[in-house]
Amino acid sequence: MEQLEEKEIIPYDVIVVGAGAAGMMAAGTAARNGKRVLLIEKMEKSGRKVRITGKGRCNVTNARPAEEFASQVRTNAEFFAPAFAEFNNRAAIRFFERAGVKLEIERGERVFPRSGKAWDIATALLEYCFENGVKIIYNTRVTGIMTLGSKVFGVRYINKRGFERKEECPNVIVATGGLSYPATGSTGDGYAFASDL
């Protein structure tokens, strides 16, 4: 008998759309904080863009003092400041080192995995999700965010078999990335979702 991948006995508290770096971090953190989390990825594996960034090495962050790093943000600074106060570049470095990824600082205070492999960063994020009980479904394309008035209550998606499904959930995090590299799955889906809200 086939296991249903889109409907669990226990409903989810959080659905995260997009299994890139931001999506995996959001999903893992929500689950670590006791939430039942579903992570939906339209590609066949997670972290595709992470795996190719920095010429395959992944420039994780910058090691400059947090205040200096934050002061460089000009666009959406009002959003960035509280988010960065919660989890800044130093916290990112600690996160990956605790996950077993040895890091090194290079010219310009850029931080890379010592192995020189972006794969290590993507793997650490995926393991973070698994360790915290995140349910991940791949080859599943979210087609819209379901709303009632101004309240979000779930997502519509097409599963890997081509069937349209709905998953109700009180919290949806859209982490679909921008339009920078469509071959990795960054096709701007999040922009469409936002314009529909």
Residue locations for each model-derived region?
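Glycine-rich active-site loop/strand segments that organize a redox cofactor
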Residues: 57-105
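Predominantly flavin-linked oxidoreductase catalytic cores and closely associated redox partners
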Residues: 52, 119-120, 124-197
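Small-residue (primarily alanine) positions within well-ordered alpha-helices
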Residues: 19-22, 26-31
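Glycine-rich FAD pyrophosphate-binding loop
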Residues: 15, 31-55
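A short, basic/flexible loop-to-alpha-helix module at the beginning of a structural domain
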Residues: 1-11, 163-164
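Beta1/beta-strand and adjacent pyrophosphate-binding region of the FAD-binding site
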Residues: 7-22
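Mobile, glycine/GP-rich and aromatic-enriched active-site lid/loop segments adjacent to catalytic centers
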Residues: 98-127, 131
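Hydrophobic anchor at the start of a short beta-strand
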Residues: 35-38, 103, 172
